[in-house]
Amino acid sequence: NARNRFITNLLPLINNATSLRRVISVFIATLEGEIQMDDFQGWHMKLMANRDHAASITTLSLESHHKDNPKVSFVHNFPGVIKSGITRGTSGVVLTALKAVVRIFGSLFYMPAEEAGDRHVFLSTSARYSAGEKDEAAGVPLSVAPDLSFARGTDGKLASGVYSINASGESAGVKVEDALASLRSRGMTQKVMDTINTDIEKALATKTKA
């Protein structure tokens, strides 16, 4: 909810930008799956189901933002395995065991922080992830690297403005595209945004009363 509020507040400024009208949401892209509306916060799900659920909520919310802001491109990406502290404060047998393994062996498979930063600069600036093939604020043109092409969006079309991207900068596969298409066909995008906006309104109302 917080990142959606953040995006909503910044979109008026982003829309008025003369270059690089883009939003990057770093989370668990390319892992989208089923959404369980009866447990929207994911308190009662198993780990993998929660992952799929949260990934789809993030991607569908970006699709909704893009529908209202077609000149802005939106990238949901998975940063890879990096030392970020994302598991701090978590509990449970599985996560505790996982954190112990990572503490011991993490240095063997962590992506260096500098490389992760470089990859995110690319996501933020390359025309590969533009709002469309004729996007005038697309960023660094594809012509600087002849082997690059427009990325495939979450709807399976090239340069369609919303992207689910893995740690290597590649789009989600057909399985994820099919999962998202199924969610859209059931009106899940609107249900997700209605739930997010209701939660935000409740939080703001509580703060106002306080």
Mark where each language-model region is.
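Active-site loop of short-chain dehydrogenase/reductase
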Residues: 13-35, 70-73
